[in-house]
Design a protein with these regions (language model features):
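Residue-level hotspots at or immediately adjacent to binding/recognition sites across diverse folds
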Residues: 2-428
């Protein structure tokens, strides 16, 4: 691992020297030098967000790969953010864009849920199996992790995003026993939530006729995106019957691309452009593709790599011309992908020689840096990565790297599935 990091860092220093020696002209398609991020003792990690200060956030496995911790990477080094009340697992599972030092995510508590629930957090942490523990959203700043409470009567909450105004979004249980829940997993109703900087909490209602809602991202204008549907098992599926946009607390249906489940926005920029993934046919089977939504054009599929099964869009830049995500072809076939002006490219065709194989792209910042999860072909480990645009003329891959299908360890595969909340086969 250290030798590969040294090689990649050396390559980046060379890129900088080239950049200083000659003026840079923007190319139609960027190419990338890749650096693996530090690990915390385990064999897999995922960089899920990057802000405009270069703070990278995500999740990393601890020694033994049985527990995960919310992680901040600064200058490539991993900093564990800890857990609430010394609970076993935590994660930053969604892109966090705040530039003022605020990070949000989820943490399991040591306590078991009094109702025997398995709330929404479990697929994103640990081994991706039900734990029966209470889970709370958290707000982290200046080394301090603070709990984000549920609505009255509830036990658990989940935080996904925070804007530069300090508004945190996610979802939280209330005290209502919901008949649309699958009681083997979830009993209490949950609703989309905004936790304001002053500590107050606001509910964002579902669409008329739906039971539950959840918020997944917020921009600096206070526009919130998320899902509306039935309770189910409180993870995707029927809880995402509709992709929604809340403006001033009012929900608008964003439409669909043929499906009535898994309609999930993942990010919204300050121009109101939304990306995510959505089913292409009725039913809860995972037949989703990445989508882009604009006010002028509505929801449109971004497609997937030909022959693959599904795709997701995970992050978008402010200009809206670059989107990053994942194309998946099977249990061991994952590829980080980039859409530039909606044209899809396997990122492994854009990297310098000696780069690791890029499995998943989680987010992109305004300078074009992309973060995600890679496969180190020497060690078999799956560290987080940052990909940095390189000057034109730098030697890059002439073709897509040979796809390392069948070589992914179970820990690496599960870490990628944890990024999307699919680490367990119990998710329908």
């Amino acid at each position: 691992m250290l030798s590969r990091i040294s090689t990649c860092l050396g390559a980046l220093i060379l890129f900088i020297a080239i950049a200083l020696a000659a003026p840079i002209h923007l190319a139609a398609q960027a190419h990338y030098g890749v650096v693996e991020l530090g690990e915390l003792g385990g064999t897999a990690g995922s960089a899920n967000g990057i802000n405009d200060r270069g703070w990278i956030t995500g999740t990393d496995n601890l020694t033994g790969d049985l527990t995960t911790t919310a992680t901040l990477w600064l200058n490539g080094s991993a900093i564990p953010l800890g857990t609430l009340e010394n609970g076993p697992n935590s994660a930053v599972a969604w892109p966090v864009k705040n530039n003022n030092g605020v990070i949000v995510g989820i943490s399991e508590l040591p306590d078991l849920d009094p109702l025997g629930e398995n709330f929404s957090c479990w697929p994103f942490v640990g081994t991706g199996d039900p734990t029966g523990r209470i889970c709370k959203g958290f707000r982290w700043q200046n080394g301090q992790m603070t709990e984000l409470p549920p609505f009255p009567g509830g036990y658990s909450s989940y935080a996904t995003g925070v804007n530069n105004r300090g508004q945190v979004v996610g979802w939280a249980e209330n005290g209502v026993h919901d008949s649309t829940c699958d009681p083997t997993f979830q009993i209490l109703r949950f609703r989309a939530a905004i936790w304001q900087p002053d500590g107050t909490m606001q509910e964002l209602p579902p669409l008329p006729g739906d039971s539950t809602s959840a918020a997944t991202a917020i921009n600096d204008l206070g526009q919130v995106v998320g899902i509306s549907g039935d309770c189910g098992i409180a993870v995707g599926g029927v809880s995402a019957k509709h992709a929604v946009l809340w403006e001033n607390g009012v929900a608008t249906d964003l439409g669909n691309i043929g499906g009535d489940a898994w309609n999930t926005p993942t990010a919204i920029n300050n121009h109101g452009t939304i990306v995510g993934f959505a089913n292409t046919a009725p039913g809860t089977a995972r037949v989703y593709e990445a989508f882009i939504w604009t006010k002028a054009g509505g929801m449109k599929s971004l497609g997937k790599i030909p022959g693959d099964l599904r795709s997701t869009a995970n992050g978008i830049n402010e200009k809206g011309d670059k989107i990053v995500g994942l194309s998946r072809g099977g249990p061991h076939l994952f590829r980080a992908i980039l859409w530039q002006d909606t044209k899809l490219t396997d990122m492994n065709s854009l990297t310098v020689p000696g780069s690791p194989f890029l499995l998943l792209a989680g987010d992109i910042d305004q300078q074009g840096h992309i973060v995600g999860e890679a496969l180190d072909l020497d060690t078999g480990e799956g560290p987080g990565f940052i990909a940095t645009p390189v000057p034109p003329g730098t030697i890059v891959s002439s073709a897509v790297h040979a796809t390392p299908q069948g070589t992914l360890s179970e820990n690496v595969r599960r870490q990628i599935d944890r990024r999307m909340g699919f680490a367990s086969e119990l998710i329908p």
